Amino acid sequence: MSKPWLFTVHGTGQPDPLGPGLPADTARDVLDIYRWQPIGNYPAAAFPMWPSVEKGVAELILQIELKLDADPYADFAMAGYSQGAIVVGQVLKHHILPPTGRLHRFLHRLKKVIFWGNPMRQKGFAHSDEWIHPVAAPDTLGILEDRLENLEQYGFEVRDYAHDGDMYASIKEDDLHEYEVAIGRIVMKASGFIGGRDSVVAQLIELGQRPITEGIALAGAIIDALTFFARSRMGDKWPHLYNRYPAVEFLRQI
């Protein structure tokens, strides 16, 4: 029987598909049982993020087709972190699961999917990475509006590692977090953090020109966002960092 393929996609700021990072480090730990295809030709850019995601989606689709068409007996798994989780989530939701999807013919060969810090996380669907951060609460979901749905009904297994306090992967459905979703939408489309009408700062100013009754929730969302990004310099204490070893063990269960 053919070795299964593992496709991995790095997060923002990690364009080297072979470099250090959760997906690649996880793959290196299971090379005895998987063939590994890291996704390159993908800038993993912070700004503008959505075009970067689209390039990652196109490359992941291409590599899945190339590898699985060449070996009709090979199963496969996918793993993505942060922006890479969006790439994997987009391919899964829009190209593998729909009967009309370009990759739907491979659905029965998909065995495992791993996400860390997933902005497309399905509400209430979260797993512990057995580390220092608590797992996301049952009433939380990913920050993007285009989220995964009904993952429990499919034949493949999923681990969606999400921490409480990870703004990308764990928000609630209330007024404050509605603005965090809007901030997430801004990050996807913005040309940069500051400078120009399409920067994050300019778009936040525009978002702030809302009725005064909405001001408290908006201010809270902006404070949450700025606090979250500031904590990225805190090392392991940043909730958007994850422990890979439960994912390694999960992949080994084949």
UniProtKB/Swiss-Prot annotation:
Q: Does the keyword Acyltransferase apply?
A: no
Q: State the InterPro entries in the record.
A: AB_hydrolase_fold, Cutinase/axe, Lysin_B_C_ter
What domain of life does the UniProt record list for this protein's source? Viruses
> What Gene3D superfamilies does the record point to?
alpha/beta hydrolase, Lysin B, C-terminal linker domain
Query: Could you provide one GO biological process annotation from this protein's UniProt record?
Result: viral release from host cell by cytolysis
Q: How the protein is affected by changing S82A? A: Complete loss of mycolylarabinogalactan esterase activity
For this UniProt record, the keywords arranged alphabetically read as follows: Antimicrobial, Bacteriolytic enzyme, Cytolysis, Host cell lysis by virus, Hydrolase, Viral release from host cell
**Coiled-coil region:** none
- Residues the record marks as active site: S82, D166, H240
Q: Which SUPFAM superfamilies match?
A: alpha/beta-Hydrolases
Single GO term (MF): hydrolase activity
Query: What are its E.C. numbers?
Result: 3.1.-.-
Annotated family: Belongs to the L5likevirus endolysin B protein family.
* Function (record text): Endolysin that degrades the junction between mycolic acid and peptidoglycans in the host cell wall and participates with the holin protein in the sequential events which lead to the programmed host cell lysis releasing the mature viral particles. Once the holin has permeabilized the host cell membrane, the endolysin can reach the periplasm and break down the mycolic acid-rich outer membrane. Cleaves the ester linkage joining the mycolic acid-rich outer membrane to arabinogalactan, releasing free mycolic acids.
- What protein is this chain from? Endolysin B
